[in-house]
């Protein structure tokens, strides 16, 4: 979908490669923008560093093998993809939109940027991809955050309390 800004991922990869960082982009998912992203990769001469795998039933397999997750969306309600990556010890490079700032702590569990700021996202990606110690530490903090804040034994009581408050207000 256009709001996910997959072409930004290709632009970010091009900038990271220009900085001399050896890496590749694995893009998971199908949608109306996939062909445009593939076309942009060809135009930039980086198609060979991109793998477009389409929709996948087990995203965790790809997240577990990733160094970073790029999430340059212009809209994001909660940020489930970010949370899934964090649970796999993968730092998230994302737009500062929707629920993402609630999930990703800038500079601690990932990096947040304004929507469309591919230069900053590329700089963040290049730094994390070229500094294994920093990437590993950020990934560990990401996992700790995901587990401590979003475990079922933490979240379910919060939902129960919320619904009890709603029901109590309706009874009055």
Residue ranges, per PLM feature:
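A conserved nucleotide-sugar
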Residues: 6-52
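A short, well-ordered alpha-helix in the C-terminal region of glycosyltransferases
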Residues: 120, 127, 134-149, 155-161
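An anion/phosphate-binding loop that grips the pyrophosphate of nucleotide cofactors and donors
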Residues: 66
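Short glycine/serine-rich donor-binding loops of glycosyltransferases
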Residues: 59, 79-82, 100
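Short hydrophobic beta-strand element within catalytic cores of glycosyltransferases
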Residues: 91-94, 104
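Aromatic "clamp/platform" in nucleotide-sugar-dependent glycosyltransferases that forms part
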Residues: 55, 74
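Conserved acidic donor-binding segment of nucleotide-sugar-dependent glycosyltransferases
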Residues: 106-107, 111-118, 127-132
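A short hydrophobic beta-strand element within the catalytic core of glycosyltransferases
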Residues: 69-70
């Amino acid at each position: 979908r256009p709001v996910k800004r997959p072409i930004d991922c290709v632009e970010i990869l091009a900038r990271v490669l220009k900085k001399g960082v050896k890496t590749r982009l694995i893009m998971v998912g199908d949608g109306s923008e996939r062909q445009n992203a593939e076309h942009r990769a060809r135009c930039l001469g980086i198609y060979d560093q991109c793998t477009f795998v389409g929709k996948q039933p087990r995203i965790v397999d790809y997240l577990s093998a990733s160094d970073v997750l790029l999430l340059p969306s212009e809209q994001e309600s909660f940020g489930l993809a970010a949370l899934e990556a964090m649970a796999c010890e993968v730092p998230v490079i994302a737009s500062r939109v929707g629920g993402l700032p609630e999930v990703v702590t800038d500079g601690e569990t990932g990096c947040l940027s304004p929507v469309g700021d591919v230069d900053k996202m590329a700089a963040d990606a290049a730094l994390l991809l070229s500094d294994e110690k920093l990437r590993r530490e950020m990934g560990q903090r990401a996992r700790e955050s995901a587990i401590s804040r979003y475990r079922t034994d933490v979240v379910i009581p919060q939902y129960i309390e919320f619904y009890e408050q709603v029901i109590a207000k309706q009874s009055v």
